[in-house]
Amino acid sequence: MSQEFAHLSVLLEETVGGLNIKDDGIYIDGTFGRGGHSRQVLQRLGENGRLIAIDRDPQAIEAAKQFADDPRFQIVHGGFGQLADYVEELGLVGKIDGVLLDLGVSSPQLDDAERGFSFLRDGPLDMRMDNSQGETAAQWLARAEIEDMAWVFKTYGEEKNARHIARCIAADRDKTPFLRTKDLADLIARITKNKERNKHPATRVFQAIRIYINSELDQIDQALEGALTILAPQGRLSIISFHSLEDRIVKRFIRRHSQGESVPHGLPITEDQINKSRKLRAIGKAIMPSDEEIERNARARSSVLRIAERLDY
């Protein structure tokens, strides 16, 4: 694999192991990236197994050519939020043995200045996962109302100074538009008074804009609900999150479908009927990276893996 596609997959063994792979199983890697997790899945599959990978990044689709000669593998160019639609088109609803999701932005995307994801590298203020379509971060910042920007920064970045930053962006863009990552990062650094130790002042705003531009949290919601409809009995969900907003969605989803439907106290309903509404069971507790993995790959530090299994009722 070329250096351009180099990428260290986080919690690799734990995530793929959590799928409990069967020789002839059918699996989905909803976030192909540079293929680290897919490679491990293929190594564990038998010759009759199948892996469907999904990614909306054109560079990831290019990277998938490394598996072009493997008849068990296919790649779909699209968002993982639509995974149930792709599976339905393939006639595989109820036959999927596992879904893997590695959420957030990948290292190659962060490291490529031209993608505009990082405040540490100057490049076009883009931030689109699929840079062949949609509105860029620069275009959104040029038109967004102060209230809208403040809401995005607060909701998706948990930024305490959301309104102040939004006002400053609106005031400055009338003189000079924000076209580069450095333009935005420098402004935020300049106007932020109480800086967090070991954290760039622009971290939360960049995260918020990226999540908004790519509808990332909506994609997660859609993917999780879709996974329930396509998983076979005992099929597994193996999901890596990188910040609290992502993990909160995954955690609540698993909890909600593990507990079954809530019914008012006193209704004449049996425990068996309640159990039938349970669709998942959590497999163990949340898994964090080891100190050794964090030392090898600092970006693993905030990762959280959650695994769940589709119940057979």
From Swiss-Prot:
It catalyses: cytidine(1402) in 16S rRNA + S-adenosyl-L-methionine = N(4)-methylcytidine(1402) in 16S rRNA + S-adenosyl-L-homocysteine + H(+). Its EC number is 2.1.1.199. It is found in: Cytoplasm. It comes from the Bacteria. One of its GO terms (cellular component) is cytoplasm. Keywords: Cytoplasm, Methyltransferase, rRNA processing, S-adenosyl-L-methionine, Transferase. The keyword Nucleotide-binding does not apply. Gene3D superfamilies: Putative methyltransferase TM0872, insert domain, Vaccinia Virus protein VP39. S-adenosyl-L-methionine binds at residues 35-37, 55, 80, 102, 109. GO terms for molecular function: rRNA (cytosine-N4-)-methyltransferase activity. GO terms for biological process: rRNA base methylation. InterPro entries: RsmH, SAM-dep_MeTrfase_MraW_recog, SAM-dependent_MTases_sf. The keyword S-adenosyl-L-methionine applies. Belongs to the methyltransferase superfamily. RsmH family. Specifically methylates the N4 position of cytidine in position 1402 (C1402) of 16S rRNA. This is Ribosomal RNA small subunit methyltransferase H. It comes from Shewanella sp. (strain ANA-3).
